[in-house]
A protein has these predicted regions:
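Carbohydrate-associated surface elements
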Residues: 135, 153
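A short, well-ordered alpha-helix in the C-terminal region of glycosyltransferases
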Residues: 305, 312-326, 333, 339
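Membrane-proximal helix-turn-helix segments that form the acceptor-binding/catalytic region
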Residues: 66-74, 89-95, 106-129
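Acidic anion/phosphate-binding donor-loop and adjacent secondary structure
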Residues: 2, 110, 154-172
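Nucleotide-sugar-dependent
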Residues: 185, 231-237, 242-267, 274-282
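Conserved catalytic-core segment of nucleotide-activated headgroup transferases in glycan assembly
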Residues: 21-36, 40, 156-158, 168-240
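Conserved acidic donor-binding segment of nucleotide-sugar-dependent glycosyltransferases
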Residues: 286-297, 305-311
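C-terminal alpha-helical cap of glycosyltransferases
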Residues: 4, 330-347
Length: 347
């Protein structure tokens, strides 16, 4: 389909090939835009493998599960692929209708078998790549002529700002962390700092929101609260926190992360403490939103400063919310995505 007159030829139909309903890469990079894109003349038809509509399915059927979506996508004007399509080996990518666009929010060439060999070939077979940050864009720019940087955005209609009254009335100082259990290794790097802080501050506690408990070694158990992740309660869980933390190692994999934990905390009006790695550093530079912490002493100092200053917590939290509204708002990002999709048909 060629759009000779872009102003009058829309709407267009976009086939979105995604994965399980709770997979973050599908939820926040693609699915949350379906309604918003329709407002910009892009009608999205999402194709979720039947076997993954409620759960993630590992194993050898990873490639075969996408075949029905591949055939159904032939009726669309263009195809939008979740990064879950990148397995570290080529499967059906070359058989998809063109234009085809790959969305990536992780350094997928590092975490897959044979990824550093196959991912470049997959990227070359794409007409465009949408990357979650500049680090990813630089990599894919070596293999695809059209690469766009589009950050993972926040649905501000859903992620409400925690009320100032609640922040001011809370007696406990709740250090919050949310994420999948696979990322507990980054918490391990600051476990000794957390343990010391929790023991030395009577009103402090640590709140974990995840899919599985963390088997920590040093934390005082009476100061740790585990909350099983629940899609319907993920926002209210943020409102129970005083500060959100995002510790990371500094390596090629973490530089590909898109700072989504930080953005979730900020959308709720929480101050943040984060390792200044990759996109985290970029987000920290956009406002007076919290602290960068690069050593045990810096983590301890940041926690201590916020613990003793409720007004600073609120100040940082409000500034963080404004940064999200300005730079990471799903309503705004939807317009950027629509322009990208239309450009593939009008060029």
């Amino acid at each position: 389909m060629t759009q000779d007159d872009p102003e009058n030829a829309w709407p267009i139909t976009l086939a979105a090939l995604t994965t399980g309903l709770n997979r973050p890469s599908s939820r926040f990079r693609m699915r949350q835009y379906i309604t918003r894109l329709a407002e910009h003349g892009v009608n999205v038809q999402e194709h979720i493998p039947f076997i993954e509509k409620t759960c993630y399915f590992p194993g050898p059927l990873k490639a075969i599960r996408h075949i029905p979506g591949l055939f159904r996508s032939r009726n669309a004007d263009l195809v939008w692929l979740s990064r879950s399509f990148v397995k570290g080996y080529e499967t059906f990518e070359r058989f998809l209708k063109r234009p085809r666009i790959l969305d990536v929010d992780d350094a997928v060439w590092l975490g897959r078998p044979l990824g550093r060999f196959a991912v470049p070939d997959i990227a070359r077979s794409m007409d465009a790549v949408i990357a979650g940050n500049t680090y990813l864009a630089e990599y894919f720019g070596s293999y695809c002529n059209k690469v766009y940087v589009v950050p993972t955005a926040i649905d501000l209609d859903r992620y409400k700002l925690c009320s100032q009254a609640l922040m001011e009335s809370r007696e406990e100082f709740v250090i919050g962390w949310t994420g999948t259990a696979s990322n507990y290794k980054y918490l391990k790097n600051i476990e000794s700092v957390l343990a010391r802080f929790l023991r030395e501050h009577s009103q402090a506690e640590f709140m974990l929101v995840s899919d599985r408990c963390w088997e920590y070694d040093l934390l005082p158990p009476e100061k740790v609260r585990f909350v099983m992740w629940d899609r319907e309660k993920e926002v209210s869980a943020l409102h129970s926190m005083s500060v959100g933390i995002m510790p990371l190692a500094d390596d090629k994999w973490t530089r590909g992360k898109c700072s989504f934990k930080m953005l979730q905390y900020m959308s709720a009006g929480l101050p943040v403490i984060a390792s200044p790695v990759g996109m985290n550093r970029e987000v920290l530079q956009k406002g007076d939103i919290g602290f960068a912490a690069d050593s045990p002493d810096e983590w301890y100092e940041a926690l201590t400063t916020l613990y003793g200053d409720r007004s600073l917590q609120i100040k940082f939290g409000q500034a963080g919310r404004k940064v999200v509204e300005q730079f990471y708002n799903a309503d705004t990002i939807a317009g950027e995505l629509a322009d990208i999709f239309k450009a593939q048909l009008s060029g």
